[in-house]
Amino acid sequence: MALYRGNSRKLIASLGAVLVLFVLVHQLSYVDYYTLVGHISASTELIQACPRPNRPKHKTSHDARQAVAGRNIPNIVHQIWKTADVRTYPAWSSRDSWRAGLEPFNYTVWLWTDDDIVGLIRAEYAWLLPTYEGYPQNIQRADVARLVVVHAHGGIYADLDVHPKSVQGVSCLQRLGLEAIFAPTSGALGLSNHFFMAERASPFLLWALHEAKRRGASTSRRIILPYLQVFWSTGPMMVTAASRDYDRARAATQPVLGVLDDEYGGTVVRHAAGRSWHRSDGRLFNYLGDHVHVEQPWVGFPLLVAALGLVCIMVRRRGWRWPASRPGKGVSF
C-alpha cells in the first residue's frame, strides 16, 4: 500500500511538471519576434541625439523627410486619467510639470477622462468600440486610448508619471520629419507607449489600432499572466509587432518611425515608472528587465525556468497543500 502511494505521488508530480511545462511553453508563444532579434526594424530609426551631430552637407534622408508636405507633430500634449481630478492619481502627477514647462512655448496640454475617450471612440472609431469595452483590464483600455487620441489630433502622449526634462529636446524631436517617435523598451529593440509623439492621422497609429483589435479581448484572455496579457494585447509588444508588420507592408526605403536611445531619451523626459497597475508577475519581469538583459531567448528562457524551479523548491520544502475549500466557497487567492 505504501509503495502504491509513493508511486501515485511520483505520477502526480510528473503530470504536474508536464502540465506546468506545457503552460510555460504556451505562454512563451505569445512573446513576439522582436524579443528574439538583435536590431530594430528597418522603418525605425534609433535617435541618439537631436539635432544630430556631424550632419553631412549633401541632401540626406532627413532633408527629404522635412520636405514631405504636411508632416509635422502638433504642439499638443495628451494625458489620460479616470477623471479630471489628477489628485486621485497614486503618484506625483506630471500634469503641472508639462503645463509649466511647455505652455509658455505655445503648447496645449490636454487631459482626457474616461468619458472623453468613450465619446471620441463612439464618434470616430466605432469599429473599435466593442474591443475597447471588452478588455478585462482598465490598463488595456488606457493603452488603446492613448493611440486613439494621438491619431485623432496628433501631438505628444505622456503618462502621468512621465515628466519633461527638456522643452528644446521635445521640440527638436517634433521637427525631425518622422511620422512617429517612441520611447524605448528592451534596450531599444522595442517601442514603449509611456511616451510617444506622432503626426495627426498617422498611418502607423491606425495600423497599431487595427493590430490591437486583432489581438482583442477574447484572444488576450488565453494569456494567464496579467502582465504578459497587457503587454501582448495593447502594450509595447503589440506596438512593436505592429511596427515590424508596418515595415514589411510599406517596403520603405527610409525610416518613418523613430525610437529614442535609452540614454538620450533620459535627457528629454524622466519616467518615474509608477507601475501601479502591475501585479506580482509584472514586478518580477520589471525587475529582470531593469537589471538583466533578458531580450535574448538564451537568457530569458533559462531565467524563467530557474524562477519556476525556485518556486517548486519552496513549495516542496514548505510541504504546501491546497487549502481545503469551505462548503459553498471556492479557494481565494
What are these regions (language model features)?
Residues 143-155:
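Small-residue hinge/turn detector
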Residues 2-142, 158-333:
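Glycosyltransferase-associated regions of secretory-pathway enzymes
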